[in-house]
Design a protein with these regions (language model features):
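A short aromatic-anchored loop/beta-hairpin motif
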Residues: 1-126, 130-187
Length: 187
């Protein structure tokens, strides 16, 4: 059974009042959403790891310096020991969740090896962990004004610097998120 409205391929933009450190000033891409719950990746919280460190830990040699320096994100509080590679869905890299308009999440070693060889997807983001919501939880958080929503834009995912993604996603709505009040509905 599908959810009444699917937020797949949308950004969840954390309101300034959302204090949970996993989502504070966060922009999350919803990758799966149905009646059973939702799954997404936080796109603007860097971890302490780089791609080079992840590849070394997995004994995958040959990463070019630019790839090795690329930051790995904290994708959310669930399964932080597991890597998720968000990329354009141009090739099959083993088990993948395909969603939206040509995006996929792959968790296989194969995609990491392809990236290290230089024949992986040109545009990708790697995250450790993901954000998950139970049945109806995301909808309730949206009703409670924890999130703004907007259709996802590839340029924000792949081309915008990490530290600018929250503002850029809100900018799609034509607002300066830093000027949004933490208090809503009080006269």
């Amino acid at each position: 059974m599908a959810a009444a409205h699917s937020w797949v391929d949308h950004f969840l933009i954390a309101m300034p009042s959302l204090a949970d450190p996993h989502f504070f000033r966060g922009v999350t891409l919803v990758c799966q959403h149905d009646a059973e719950g939702a799954m997404g990746l936080v796109l603007n919280h860097p971890s302490d790891f780089t791609m080079g460190e992840v590849l070394r830990q997995m004994d995958i040699p040959g990463a070019a310096p630019a790839l090795a320096r690329q930051p790995v994100l904290l994708g959310g509080p669930v399964q932080r020991d597991r890597g998720f590679v968000l990329h354009e869905d141009a090739r099959d890299f083993g088990p993948s969740l395909r969603f939206g308009h040509g995006l996929a999440i792959s968790t296989s070693r194969e995609i990491l090896e392809a990236l290290a060889r230089g024949d992986g997807p040109a545009d990708f983001v790697m995250a450790l962990g993901y954000a998950g919501w139970g049945a109806g939880q995301l909808e309730e958080e949206i009703v409670q004004n924890s999130w703004l929503t907007v259709p996802a834009e590839r340029a924000i995912i792949f081309d915008t610097p990490i530290e600018r993604r929250w503002q850029a996603a809100a900018g799609v709505l034509g607002i300066d998120i830093s000027g949004v009040s933490d208090s809503v509905g009080h006269a």
